[in-house]
Amino acid sequence: MKVISSIQELRDQLRGQNRVAFVPTMGNLHEGHLSLMRLARQHGDPVVASIFVNRLQFGPNEDFDKYPRTLQDDIEKLQKEGVYVLFAPTERDMYPEPQEYRVEPPHDLGDTLEGEFRPGFFKGVCTVVMKLFCCVQPRVAVFGKKDYQQLMIVRRMAHQFALPVDIVPAETVRADDGLALSSRNVYLTNEERAEAPELYRTLHQVRQDVLETVLQGQASHEEVTTKAMDYLRGRGWQPDYVAVRRRSDLQKPTPENIAAGEPLVVLTAAKLGKTRLIDNLEI
């Protein structure tokens, strides 16, 4: 596996490769990331991964400086997965001058849910993903469903810009107790780690309530999610949101949508101690 930091060297290395499968990451790799590499191999060849902690998507009070950086361990893991190239640029490589041009998602998708609680986050995500796509020029790119809103935004961005890249979704990888694997799980104390799977169990309860009451016209989805947030608060969580949305565009479902059987998803973000966790479950 070649480890490359220069954009020009990356382009030279990939010249003539027209089925590149790409997996962008911020490093501190776990089994969830490695499953993306395996899925990428099913859709293209060679597999290219990137590791870049993107300052543009971190807010002023977020964990950019503390975000775990484990490059040597990550390199060893990617080598075992047979990754062809790891693109690991420095900030100077990616942003040799201030990044004045940005890619901003539409308000209805970029400023709700995560976008409401992390202003500017998706502008940073879209900008770096677009730049990585320009550097790698993949035919396929794999994004995990754990970051459901990010997946939807990147997919729409690729469509609206007519980018020649297929966005492939990957199922969330979970620990045996249901907790979604995340690089930020390392921040959890032992007690918090024992409590953390309750977030996924709460999503299952919301799904059950939607199926048994909302779809039967006996309750609104807002009543169901309010109950879920109250439940989490009672267990010591600080939920930002629990929300039922349409899978197609992450907008709130209307009664007509629900009656017509519109596919739905429930999404959540909540703090446990100092650690903010996100998760989702399709209904």
Curated annotation (Swiss-Prot):
Binding residues annotated for ATP, in chain numbering: 26-33, 144-147, 173, 181-184
Active-site residues, Swiss-Prot/TrEMBL: 33
E.C. numbers: 6.3.2.1
Coarse class of the protein's main subcellular location: cytoplasm
Binding site for (R)-pantoate: 57, 150
Binding site for beta-alanine: 57
GO biological process: pantothenate biosynthetic process
Molecular function GO terms recorded: ATP binding; pantoate-beta-alanine ligase activity
Reactions listed under catalytic activity: (R)-pantoate + beta-alanine + ATP = (R)-pantothenate + AMP + diphosphate + H(+)
Location within or outside the cell: Cytoplasm
Pfam families the record matches: Pantoate_ligase
A single Gene Ontology CC term: cytosol
Chain's role: Catalyzes the condensation of pantoate with beta-alanine in an ATP-dependent reaction via a pantoyl-adenylate intermediate.
Protein family: Belongs to the pantothenate synthetase family.
The protein's name in its UniProt record: Pantothenate synthetase
UniProt gene name: panC
